[in-house]
Amino acid sequence: MTAPLPGMEEIEDPAVVREEMISAFEDASKDLASNTSYYDAERRPEAIGVTVPREMQQLLAHVGYPRLYVDSVAERQAVEGFRLGDADEADEELWQWWQANNLDIEAPLGYTDAYVHGRSFITISKPDPQLDLGWDQNVPIIRVEPPTRMHAEIDPRINRVSKAIRVAYDKEGNEIQAATLYTPMETIGWFRADGEWAEWFNVPHGLGVVPVVPLPNRTRLSDLYGTSEITPELRSMTDAAARILMLMQATAELMGVPQRLIFGIKPEEIGVDSETGQTLFDAYLARILAFEDAEGKIQQFSAAELANFTNALDQIAKQVAAYTGLPPQYLSTAADNPASAEAIRAAESRLIKKVERKNLMFGGAWEEAMRIAYRIMKGGDVPPDMLRMETVWRDPSTPTYAAKADAATKLYGNGQGVIPRERARIDMGYSVKEREEMRRWDEEEAAMGLGLLGTMVDADPTVPGSPSPTAPPKPQPAIESSGGDA
């Protein structure tokens, strides 16, 4: 008897596997609440210690370092297309699939979940005319799922998902009311009816691979499931900043205004009820205290200095910048003088390099997802050029429009530089459609004789029906006759 290949083991009882995967999902979800609390800057009383009085705990501040860091990375990631093999432009069909699934909105949210929890997931399925009403049957359904709703097991022998489960909770978020099991050969769905599981659908896709692709925030080769970007050192700095802000507020409440000592007067003269001791007006904050007793004296303590707290917060912000690579101006620790454009780019270099590395990891996941989507919709194996697919990302740096234009102009050099006109337009960030329109305008100008022959009006394979005009023949020198006319 031949043993099954790794990742292709037969599932005898899907219901048993469903229960095992739901249990694994619940175990993997235990630590997600802590990640969420840091990202959402929720109150965490355990972060301020047991010696702090209960009344003082109300002053605990919400510190948003984790959200600032995660959002600063995720907001710089934007997919612009998928290029196949040696193609010059992005593939139009794959981009239509991307747009039809609203992935320009959903994908960045998936990146945020991957940074907060260490992972998120991409699911691919073929539309069902009975279930997916109103959906284009020629477009695959591609969804991004958070780890709070999905779990996948990765087989280390093949470094690929062996099975996955997606769950849906009830309105209260207490009980799972639906589950979908993804296997290499079929996708099975269940829902709860009267407390019992009932089969919802069964799709035998026969792909040989699980139609689930993880988006792991990996930091090492051995890290198959991903690691949260909210690292222990970032958590400790967040808690320290919350404690310092709490102490600063308490100090401002108690000693921020100078304390006064008054001698030789009756309490009634400054508005204190002799029976209850209740202050009738706020003598603590009053600027002028007047009383009739000539023997009365008043003295004042110095107000508490809060500079030590602000200095401590500045040091914590510098530690956060060192751990995360965030530019100082993101943490409000920059100098009063505005930085130059070169200084800003230099400060962002670590952040940009981090985003570029994340783009490579997530780009590989999207390429695998698109290959699975192609197999689901077209059948058979993927063509060779799809094996060399490349995800096209927007430039994660932040050059100004004028700086990009200046660089592109100098590199193009009016046709004499190191890059052609089309490369300059790509560097400027124009989309595929915009560049096609520009090429058509170039052709129109060439037809009117505006001097662009031989540059952009040559045959362009990326523009269907592009004309191939030829330059007018050069004038030939006149041929002198050897003899005179009779």
From Swiss-Prot:
Question: What InterPro entries is this protein classified in?
Answer: Portal_protein_SPP1_Gp6-like
Q: Pro residues bias located where?
A: 464-476
Q: Which family does it belong to?
A: Belongs to the SPP1-like portal protein family.
Region Disordered, residue ranges: 456-486
* Record's keyword terms, sorted: Capsid protein, Viral capsid assembly, Viral genome ejection through host cell envelope, Viral genome packaging, Viral long flexible tail ejection system, Viral penetration into host cytoplasm, Viral release from host cell, Virion, Virus entry into host cell
**Compartments (UniProt record):** Virion
Which residue windows are coiled coil?
none
Purpose of the protein: Forms the portal vertex of the capsid. This portal plays critical roles in head assembly, genome packaging, neck/tail attachment, and genome ejection. The portal protein multimerizes as a single ring-shaped homododecamer arranged around a central channel. Binds to the terminase subunits to form the packaging machine.
Subunit and partners: Homododecamer.
Gene Ontology cellular component?
Answer: viral capsid
Q: Does the keyword Oxidoreductase apply?
A: no
Kindly state a single biological-process term from the GO annotations of this entry. Answer: symbiont genome ejection through host cell envelope, long flexible tail mechanism
- Going by the entry's taxonomy, the superkingdom of the source organism is recorded as Viruses
Q: What is the name listed in the Swiss-Prot or TrEMBL entry for this protein? A: Portal protein
